[in-house]
C-alpha cells in the first residue's frame, strides 16, 4: 500500500528543507488571518508577513508554495462555495498532534489578523470569534486520545470552518457583481 503524503506533511517537508521550523498550520493561519482582516491578496505583503514568521526571506521554491497557498485561500474566501480547508495534519495522525497544530493555526491566525486589521473597529461578533480562537489556541493540552477527545476536536473543527468566513465577510468589501451581458 503506497504511503499517502498529506498536504500538511508535504508543506512541512518543504519548510524543513529550507531550514524553517515553523508549522505549516501556523503559516496557513497567518495567511488566513491577514486575508480575513482585509489585507488583500498581493504577494509582496504576504511574503513580508511570512518572512517575519519564517525568520528569513523565503527561497524560490518556498515562495512558489506561498503563492500557491495564497491562491488557494483567495479561491476559498472569494469563491461561490466560501469553504475554508485548514492546513492541518490528517485524521490518521494522533489527536495530540492534530490539536497542537490547531493551536498553532489559531496563533498564526490571530497574529495575521492583528497585523492587518489596523484601526478598523471590531463588532461584537468579530470580538467573540477572536476570543474563541484565542481560547482554542490554548486547548491543545486539554484533548486526550479518547472518543470524547475526538468528538470535542471534531466540534471545534466544524466551528473553525465557519469562523474565518464570518471575519472575512465583516472586514472585506464584497466583490462588485459582474454586469450581465444584454442582448440587443
From Swiss-Prot:
Q: Which InterPro entries match?
A: YgfB-like, YgfB-like_sf
Pfam families, from UniProt? UPF0149
Q: Which GO terms describe its cellular component?
A: cytosol
Entry similarity comment: Belongs to the UPF0149 family.
Query: Which NCBIfam families does the UniProt entry name for this protein?
Result: PRK02166.1
PANTHER family per the record? UPF0149 PROTEIN YGFB
* Name of the featured protein: UPF0149 protein PSPPH_0305
Its source organism is Pseudomonas savastanoi pv. phaseolicola (strain 1448A / Race 6) (Pseudomonas syringae pv. phaseolicola (strain 1448A / Race 6))
Amino acid at each position: 500500500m503506497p504511503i499517502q503524503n498529506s498536504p500538511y506533511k508535504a508543506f512541512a517537508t518543504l519548510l524543513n528543507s529550507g531550514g524553517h521550523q515553523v508549522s505549516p498550520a501556523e503559516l496557513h493561519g497567518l495567511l488566513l488571518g491577514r486575508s480575513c482582516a482585509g489585507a488583500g491578496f498581493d504577494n509582496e505583503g504576504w511574503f513580508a508577513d511570512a518572512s517575519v514568521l519564517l525568520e528569513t526571506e523565503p527561497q524560490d521554491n518556498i515562495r512558489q508554495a506561498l503563492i500557491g497557498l495564497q491562491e488557494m485561500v483567495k479561491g476559498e474566501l472569494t469563491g461561490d462555495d466560501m469553504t475554508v480547508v485548514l492546513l492541518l495534519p490528517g485524521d490518521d495522525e494522533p489527536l495530540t498532534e492534530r490539536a497542537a497544530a490547531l493551536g498553532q493555526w489559531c496563533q498564526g491566525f490571530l497574529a495575521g489578523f492583528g497585523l492587518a486589521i489596523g484601526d478598523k473597529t471590531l463588532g461584537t461578533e468579530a470580538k467573540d470569534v477572536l476570543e474563541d480562537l484565542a481560547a482554542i489556541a490554548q486547548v491543545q493540552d486539554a484533548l486526550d486520545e479518547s472518543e470524547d477527545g475526538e468528538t470535542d476536536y471534531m466540534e471545534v473543527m466544524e466551528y473553525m470552518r465557519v469562523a474565518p468566513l464570518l471575519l472575512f465577510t465583516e472586514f472585506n468589501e464584497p466583490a462588485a457583481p459582474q454586469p450581465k451581458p444584454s442582448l440587443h
